[in-house]
UniProtKB/Swiss-Prot annotation:
General function of this protein: Component of the NF-Y/HAP transcription factor complex. The NF-Y complex stimulates the transcription of various genes by recognizing and binding to a CCAAT motif in promoters.
Keyword Transcription regulation: yes
Gene assigned in the entry: NFY2
Chain intervals with Gly residues compositional bias: 8-28
Native source species: Zea mays
Disulfide bonds: none
Keywords assigned: Activator, DNA-binding, Nucleus, Transcription, Transcription regulation
Domain of life the protein comes from: Eukaryota
Region (Subunit association domain (SAD)): 63-74
Subunit structure: Heterotrimeric transcription factor composed of three components, NF-YA, NF-YB and NF-YC. NF-YB and NF-YC must interact and dimerize for NF-YA association and DNA binding.
Taxonomic lineage of the native organism: Eukaryota, Viridiplantae, Streptophyta, Embryophyta, Tracheophyta
Location relative to the cell: Nucleus
InterPro entries for this protein: CBFA_NFYB_domain, Histone-fold, Transc_fact_NFYB/HAP3, Transcrpt_fac_NFYB/HAP3_CS
Protein name: Nuclear transcription factor Y subunit B
Main location: nucleus
CC terms in the record's Gene Ontology section: CCAAT-binding factor complex
Amino acid sequence: MAEAPASPGGGGGSHESGSPRGGGGGGSVREQDRFLPIANISRIMKKAIPANGKIAKDAKETVQECVSEFISFITSEASDKCQREKRKTINGDDLLWAMATLGFEDYIEPLKVYLQKYREMEGDSKLTAKSSDGSIKKDALGHVGASSSAAEGMGQQGAYNQGMGYMQPQYHNGDISNV
C-alpha cells in the first residue's frame, strides 16, 4: 500500500518531516529554515574524507536532510520529557537524556565533558562581564588571576578518523580531542 502524501500541518510525529524537498509536508516552512546551510554540511563532510575526495550534490543534500531529521528526533524526545516535568526550556542535560533514550549511548560521555566545559566557559564569561566592580577574576576552573578563556581546553586537536568516517573522542588531561 502506498503512503499518502502528507497534508500541510497534518499528522505524523513531532519529529517527522514532510517530503524531502518537494514542499509537501512542511506546510509554510521554507527549506532554508528547515535545513542547515549546505556549505556547512559540505565542510563537515569534507573533514571525513581524503583531501582529494569529492562529494556528490545528492550526497550533501541527503546528509543535510538527515541532520535536520536527527535534530528534530532528539529535540522531540527532550521536549516530551520537559512537558512531562512541566518545564518549558530544554537544556543540554535533556538532550543528553534523549540521546541515551534513543540509543546514542556511545556519544553521551564525550558530550557530557563538552557540555561541562561549555558551561564553565559560559559561567566564566558571565563572571568576567559582571565583575567590572574590580573584584578578583577567576577562570572557568576557579584559578585566580588566570586568563578568562577556557577555550584552550575545548579546541579540536586533530581530524576525523579517515577509516571510520566519524569522530572518535579521546581524552587527554580533561581535554576533548579527535583522532
